[in-house]
């Protein structure tokens, strides 16, 4: 697929409102970088479709790992992790702009109008190696590669203030409707929902910097999370986690907000609207589970039993775990069985 076909699929077939192109930097030539910038400028239509220029900084995990770089404007410099697969000597003239470690990347991006997100692909991001709170505003929790709650735990343990995003990364040119099929990728691609007052770059970048967004594993559920305080709270304007200034005093905060609160307790409100019935809602404070809410009782289940096999054994490219197994019951019978969350059609129940 061409880059134009890629963008048009996301806009016209997957019905995305916001998207970007995140090619591996070591494969992006100078001419292709200019082509991508022309495309995003052409396709970006405030109020209709937000198309963001950017690239994937694709370094090995040992020097920081993959990062998604999103520029607010076209014409910015691409700071590659390397020129590894760029063969044309004329494309080596900007080699001094390369950033070979995540720390160097943040240095070169300092002062630029951009947002960085920690990406979990083949070379997963190590946010304990390097992190800049003024630039890196979010971590990726789900994509075609799977689900990575561990990177959220890493961030919380380090005291980072981060948002959570989900992406496609299916390598098949189907952003927003990315299914793995018979392939190495084991999951449906993720989506990010932005809480923004308008559909334009300014509003979306403000949402990214204030972490006003959430991720899903590909469904389009609606999630409204807020906190009400009894006393006035000092809401802080933020720039990638860095407190910049206080705004007017408020008594309601939404996801991603930072505020100085004097109350000993606050009221948490969570509204979830799913495309299917909700199984449960886990509420964490940092990395600690403090409440598990189920919208049903045992009698509602009838004779159904749910068996879940999940998880990964490794953080890197070979993270996919083969969950082959069997189930046998004594003194009873299995009337019917069906799979859930299984996207590879060549796998599943062989016999029953």
Predicted regions and their residues:
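Glycine/proline-rich, flexible active-site/cofactor-binding loop segments
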Residues: 101-151
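A metal-dependent hydrolase metal-coordination microenvironment
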Residues: 1-111
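C-terminal functional module detector
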Residues: 38-40, 124-130, 135-137, 149-352
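Structural recognition of the beta-strand scaffold that forms the well-ordered cores
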Residues: 17-23, 50-54, 68-70, 115-118, ...
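Catalytic metal-binding/acid-base residues of hydrolase active sites
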Residues: 24-26, 56-58, 121-122, 145, ...
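Fold-independent oxyanion-binding glycine-rich loops
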Residues: 54-55, 72, 119-121, 143-145, ...
């Amino acid at each position: 697929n061409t880059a134009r076909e890629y963008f048009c699929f996301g806009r016209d077939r997957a019905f995305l409102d916001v998207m970007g192109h995140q090619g591996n930097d070591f494969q992006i030539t100078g001419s292709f970088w200019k082509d991508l910038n022309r495309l995003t400028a052409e396709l970006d239509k405030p109020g209709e479709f937000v198309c963001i220029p950017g690239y994937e900084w694709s370094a090995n995990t040992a020097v920081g790992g993959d990062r998604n770089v999103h520029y607010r404007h076209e014409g910015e410099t691409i700071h590659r992790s390397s020129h590894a697969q760029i063969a044309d000597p004329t494309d080596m003239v900007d080699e001094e702009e390369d950033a070979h470690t995540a720390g160097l990347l943040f240095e070169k991006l300092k002062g630029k109008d951009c947002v960085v997100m920690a990406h979990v692909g083949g070379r997963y991001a190590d946010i304990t190696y390097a992190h800049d709170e003024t630039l890196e505003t979010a971590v990726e929790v789900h994509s075609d590669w799977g689900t990575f709650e561990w990177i959220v735990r890493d961030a919380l343990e380090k005291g980072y203030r981060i948002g959570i995003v989900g992406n496609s990364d299916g390598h098949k040119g189907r952003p927003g409707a990315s299914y793995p099929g018979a392939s190495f990728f084991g999951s449906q691609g993720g989506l990010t929902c932005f809480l923004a007052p308008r559909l334009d770059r300014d509003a979306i970048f403000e949402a990214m910097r204030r972490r006003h967004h959430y991720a899903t594993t590909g469904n389009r559920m609606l999630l409204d999370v807020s906190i009400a305080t009894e006393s006035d709270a000092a809401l802080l304007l933020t720039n990638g986690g860095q407190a910049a200034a206080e705004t007017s005093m408020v008594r309601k905060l939404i996801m991603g907000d930072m505020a100085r609160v004097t109350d000993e307790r606050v009221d948490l409100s969570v509204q979830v609207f799913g495309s299917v019935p909700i199984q449960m809602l886990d509420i964490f404070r940092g990395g600690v589970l403090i409440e598990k809410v189920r919208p049903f009782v045992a009698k509602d289940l009838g004779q159904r039993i749910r068996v879940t096999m999940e998880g990964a054994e490794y953080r890197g490219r070979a993270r996919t775990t083969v969950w082959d197994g069997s189930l046998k019951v004594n003194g009873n019978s299995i009337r019917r069985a069906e799979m859930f969350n299984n996207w590879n059609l060549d796998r599943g129940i062989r016999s029953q």
